[in-house]
Amino acid sequence: MEKILAINAGSSTLKWQLFEMPSETVIAKGMIDRLGLSDSVFTAKYGDNQKFKEVQDVTTHEMAATLLLTRLKELGIVSHLDEITGVGHRVVGGGEAFSDSMVINPVALDEINRLAEYAPLHNPTQAYYIKIFTALLPGVPQVAVFDTSFYSTLAPENYLYSIPQEYYQTFGARKYGAHGTSHRYVAHRAAEILGTPLESQKMITLHLGSGASITAVQDGHAVDTSMGFTPLAGITMGTRSGDIDVSLVAFLAKKLEITMPEMIDILNHKSGLLGISELSPDMRDLEETAATRPQSALALSIFVNRVVKYVGSYVALMNGIDTLVFTAGSGENGSELRADICKQLACFGVKLDEEKNNVRSQERIISADDSKVKVLIVPTNEELMIARDVMRLK
């Protein structure tokens, strides 16, 4: 048995899980929230439903990593740090340089830092944590698991933009996608639940959280995905606009007398469900107010509309669909949302079982027995996918 630590780091959070492998048992999990502030919060769940929480100053990433390893020992989760035999790190941007997860060496770490211009909010922090854990756990393999590597199988027809090709060749201007680790996990897990090889299925996975994306999977590989050069592209999201005419972006920047970075910030943080509803980016708030606020109802309708359009285009791309999978916050918990989406996909043979669909975040098949398309809820587990890759590669 081996203990593998999975790290999912953001600029102000550090999510972690410790697995016993290969049994895939969760030994402990938790997070450090509000990093960089005076009231950072460390939480852990471990053992027989034991919970631990503390508030203290965690002002640097070094402090966060050190605190995590210290608490693992002090709480008795591990007796010695050398019990940890591998660490896996989520890395958002792998560009074209990384078509698979890999054990990190200095050259690879430099490349991850170089790719920061493609994922400026994530790569620098995630690369830094790799460096920190390498120092704190000397000799322990550090494995980077890239969000983008699942999309290395996309054909040029699906990843290239219709712009002068010198921009792709010189600057790497192309679709990279995101949420790849989540889509990869739920696709494989759905195939396991159905008892059918993934390679024999035409599957569409819907990662519907505050950030949302859709991926088409055929012959066991991703063939297209809704997010693009950045996670701003694709369907309407919590605060992101999704697809938009770029001329409108320039037009609005001029009218508002703001810079292009300021305009992009609006599209990333003030648009989507929040922008349309003028209330909230949270699907639950919109569902609660839809009956009395037309803008809330409109935001929900637009979201469903965009999802259905992408699913329809992917069905055409793959010349059919066998399986539809819902995951992430709204996808796992939103029974009404799932019903609204599937109702508009009835033309493809999608039919829900109303009773089976009335669940929250529970792994199950929710399609009717006579549905031509299998519909499932599969709660995502990026950390487990990371741990599996560590075991495969270290």
From Swiss-Prot:
<keyword id="KW-0963">Cytoplasm</keyword>
<comment type="similarity">
    <text>Belongs to the acetokinase family.</text>
</comment>
<dbReference type="InterPro" id="IPR000890">
    <property type="entry name" value="Aliphatic_acid_kin_short-chain"/>
</dbReference>
<dbReference type="GO" id="GO:0005737">
    <property type="term" value="C:cytoplasm"/>
</dbReference>
<feature type="active site" description="Proton donor/acceptor">
    <location>
        <position position="147"/>
    </location>
</feature>
<dbReference type="InterPro" id="IPR004372">
    <property type="entry name" value="Ac/propionate_kinase"/>
</dbReference>
<feature type="binding site">
    <location>
        <begin position="282"/>
        <end position="284"/>
    </location>
    <ligand>
        <name>ATP</name>
    </ligand>
</feature>
<keyword id="KW-0479">Metal-binding</keyword>
<dbReference type="Pfam" id="PF00871">
    <property type="entry name" value="Acetate_kinase"/>
</dbReference>
<feature type="binding site">
    <location>
        <begin position="207"/>
        <end position="211"/>
    </location>
    <ligand>
        <name>ATP</name>
    </ligand>
</feature>
<feature type="binding site">
    <location>
        <position position="90"/>
    </location>
    <ligand>
        <name>substrate</name>
    </ligand>
</feature>
<keyword id="KW-0418">Kinase</keyword>
<dbReference type="GO" id="GO:0008776">
    <property type="term" value="F:acetate kinase activity"/>
</dbReference>
<protein>
    <recommendedName>
        <fullName>Acetate kinase 1</fullName>
        <ecNumber>2.7.2.1</ecNumber>
    </recommendedName>
</protein>
<comment type="pathway">
    <text>Metabolic intermediate biosynthesis; acetyl-CoA biosynthesis; acetyl-CoA from acetate: step 1/2.</text>
</comment>
<keyword id="KW-0460">Magnesium</keyword>
<dbReference type="GO" id="GO:0006083">
    <property type="term" value="P:acetate metabolic process"/>
</dbReference>
<feature type="binding site">
    <location>
        <position position="382"/>
    </location>
    <ligand>
        <name>Mg(2+)</name>
    </ligand>
</feature>
<keyword id="KW-0547">Nucleotide-binding</keyword>
<dbReference type="InterPro" id="IPR023865">
    <property type="entry name" value="Aliphatic_acid_kinase_CS"/>
</dbReference>
<feature type="site" description="Transition state stabilizer">
    <location>
        <position position="179"/>
    </location>
</feature>
<comment type="function">
    <text>Catalyzes the formation of acetyl phosphate from acetate and ATP. Can also catalyze the reverse reaction.</text>
</comment>
<feature type="binding site">
    <location>
        <position position="8"/>
    </location>
    <ligand>
        <name>Mg(2+)</name>
    </ligand>
</feature>
<dbReference type="GO" id="GO:0006085">
    <property type="term" value="P:acetyl-CoA biosynthetic process"/>
</dbReference>
<dbReference type="GO" id="GO:0000287">
    <property type="term" value="F:magnesium ion binding"/>
</dbReference>
<feature type="site" description="Transition state stabilizer">
    <location>
        <position position="240"/>
    </location>
</feature>
<comment type="subunit">
    <text>Homodimer.</text>
</comment>
<dbReference type="InterPro" id="IPR043129">
    <property type="entry name" value="ATPase_NBD"/>
</dbReference>
<feature type="binding site">
    <location>
        <position position="15"/>
    </location>
    <ligand>
        <name>ATP</name>
    </ligand>
</feature>
<dbReference type="GO" id="GO:0005524">
    <property type="term" value="F:ATP binding"/>
</dbReference>
<keyword id="KW-0808">Transferase</keyword>
<keyword id="KW-0067">ATP-binding</keyword>
